[in-house]
């Protein structure tokens, strides 16, 4: 849900933030098809654990943590120093973020068995971040990079429910599919939101509830916070998980050795 660097990562072909990984994946496929076509099935098969089974359904968890834990999270939020707040998403998302706070790292460790049971596969922690949305809060429609294959989205505090919308689980979109949405137009986000084939549904999490979803295979978005809510706010804790043992697959720099295609070494991991 959030790039860990100081910029929002997108490409011309994949115009949403956090799209860099998918662009690298299809670039790698094109290279393999050109220089060693016989290796393409092996490449696709090797990275298959990062995909999401289409039978998965978004899951709402009622109070996965007790009141004392929620109070402890709020205490951390209340006592954050201004220097701890990352500002690079303030304009685009109307939020401040804090990545991998020690308390949240421990909380994420505790959540591993919960998420593993919900998603039906063993997982390990990827990264986490606290998201402090203000009256300008918004989250444009996007897919996450597979570093966030699974997301545990905990509503820590809010002044009113803020809807979030999810598509069904989808195969990763290739350039041809995206051309159907974008086609050089600036309304590609609305075209995705209104696509009947994506079957968007809406959830309105309450304080203490959490949503488990597959951000890398489900389009998702939040419309701007309703200005009628006044001094609106929403504090969310995102904890991202990956299938256990797949960390190396996430780094394009490892793909050359993975399938014996030296030309893939030119691919660089996003910084």
Predicted regions: what they are:
Residues 151, 228-247:
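A short hydrophobic beta-strand segment most commonly corresponding to one strand
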Residues 139-142, 219-230:
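Short beta-strand His + acidic residue motifs that chelate non-heme Fe in jelly-roll/DSBH
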Residues 251-271:
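Glycine- and charge-enriched low-complexity intrinsically disordered segments
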Residues 5-119:
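Non-heme Fe(II)/2-oxoglutarate
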Residues 119-130:
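A short coil-to-beta-strand element that immediately follows conserved catalytic motifs
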Residues 135-216, 246-253:
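Catalytic core of non-heme Fe(II) oxygenases with the double-stranded beta-helix
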Residues 215-225, 238-242:
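Extended, acidic-biased charged interface segments
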């Amino acid at each position: 849900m959030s790039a860990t660097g100081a910029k929002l990562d997108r490409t011309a072909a994949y115009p949403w933030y956090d799209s860099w990984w998918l662009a690298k994946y299809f670039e790698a496929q094109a290279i393999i098809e050109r220089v060693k076509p016989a290796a393409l099935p092996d490449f696709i098969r090797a990275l298959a654990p990062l995909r999401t089974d289409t039978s998965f359904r978004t899951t709402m968890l009622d109070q996965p943590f007790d009141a004392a834990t929620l109070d402890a999270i709020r205490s951390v939020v209340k006592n954050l120093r201004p220097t701890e707040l990352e500002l690079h998403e303030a304009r685009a998302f109307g939020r401040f973020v804090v990545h991998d706070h020690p308390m949240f790292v421990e909380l994420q460790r505790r959540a591993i068995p919960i998420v593993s049971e919900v998603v039906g596969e063993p997982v390990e922690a990827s990264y986490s971040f606290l998201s402090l949305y203000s009256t300008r809060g918004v989250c444009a429609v996007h897919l996450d990079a597979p570093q966030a294959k699974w997301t545990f989205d905990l509503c820590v505090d809010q002044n009113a429910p803020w809807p979030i919308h999810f598509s069904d689980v989808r195969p990763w979109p290739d350039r041809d599919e995206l051309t159907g949405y974008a086609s050089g137009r600036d309304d590609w986000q609305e075209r995705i939101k209104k696509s009947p084939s994506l079957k968007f549904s809406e959830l309105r999490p309450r304080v203490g509830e959490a949503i488990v979803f597959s951000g890398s295979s489900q389009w998702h978005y939040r419309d701007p916070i309703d200005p009628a809510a006044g001094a609106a706010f929403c504090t969310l804790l995102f904890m991202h998980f990956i299938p256990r043992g797949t960390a190396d697959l996430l780094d394009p720099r490892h793909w050359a050795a993975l399938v014996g295609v030296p030309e893939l070494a030119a691919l660089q991991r996003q910084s």
